């Protein structure tokens, strides 16, 4: 099977399965309402979660291409440079999750092997990376469904610690989004070390009629009106700290445009997802 099944007893008190008629922008929004999916797909998206993770747009194109091509094509020194920057959830530097992502993305190995690999990674998130024997012992005491629920909680906590938004990582594909968090954490470390330049991109949100009545700041004619409160704050921060979350939520066409796979030649990262 290319999915994991959740049982009723796997969910904590106060949670139940998502009704078929309820659709959410993110898995986190679904959980806030006390619901959880009955299945977690390995390769496809979770039913009932509508918005993809736009955080993939922040992954450096060169780094992404390297991960898809495989680390073994690099010179040993370059491979070591990337592997040494791996972090959460790993406590020991290695290419475990990077290789898993490539195998998942390129469909290189069978579904059963992919599932076992993901369970190992999930066990590391929940039970630590230092003692494999102790980790396996703890894993044997917990159902797979409960592990998946706890994994979602850990990932949401990591999103907040990384100061990401729940639009950047929506949980629509929980398996891929775990890889996304790992890759963004890796990329941040590479930027800090000066290995790659910080990626900055600017988006032009297309003009559209808006029913929102913007707040007025002051009475002078030169004062600007803003569609969103975040627009005013964005004028005072560094470009890398600009918050476009309200734009992503409001303008569905902007999300579709940014994630459109027809832009393969112009934007290989998006086209390759």
From Swiss-Prot:
Purpose: Acts as a weak IFN antagonist.
Keyword field contains Ion transport: no
Chief place where the protein resides: host cell
Full protein name: Non-structural protein NS-S
Family note: Belongs to the phlebovirus NS-S protein family.
One cellular component (GO) term of this entry: host cell cytoplasm
Record text on subunit structure and interactions: Interacts with host MAVS; this interaction weakly inhibits the host IFN response.
Stretches assigned to coiled coil: none
Annotated compartments: Host cytoplasm
């Amino acid at each position: 099977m290319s999915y994991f099944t959740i049982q009723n007893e796997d969910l904590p008190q106060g949670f139940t399965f998502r009704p078929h008629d309820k659709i959410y922008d993110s898995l986190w929004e679904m959980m806030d309402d006390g619901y959880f999916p009955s299945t977690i797909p390995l390769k496809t998206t979770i039913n009932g979660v509508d918005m993809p993770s736009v955080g993939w747009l922040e992954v450096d194109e060169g780094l992404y291409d390297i991960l898809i091509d495989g680390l073994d094509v690099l010179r040993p020194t370059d491979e070591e440079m990337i592997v040494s920057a791996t972090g959460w959830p790993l406590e020991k530097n290695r290419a475990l999750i990077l290789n898993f992502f490539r195998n998942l993305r390129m469909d290189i190995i069978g579904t059963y092997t992919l599932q076992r690999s993901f369970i190992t990674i999930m066990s590391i998130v929940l039970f630590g990376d230092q003692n494999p024997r102790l980790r396996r012992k703890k894993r044997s005491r917990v159902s797979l469904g409960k592990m998946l629920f706890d994994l979602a909680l850990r990932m949401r906590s990591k999103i907040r610690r990384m100061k990401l938004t729940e639009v950047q990582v929506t949980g629509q594909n929980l398996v891929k989004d775990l890889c996304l968090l790992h890759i963004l954490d890796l990329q941040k470390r590479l930027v800090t070390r000066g290995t790659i330049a910080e990626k900055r991109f600017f988006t032009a949100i297309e003009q559209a009629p808006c029913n929102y009545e913007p707040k007025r700041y002051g009475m002078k004619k030169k004062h600007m009106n803003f569609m969103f409160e975040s627009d005013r704050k964005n004028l005072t921060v560094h470009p890398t700290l600009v918050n476009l979350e309200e734009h992503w939520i409001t303008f569905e066409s902007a999300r579709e445009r940014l994630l459109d796979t027809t832009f393969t030649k112009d934007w290989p990262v998006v086209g390759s997802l």
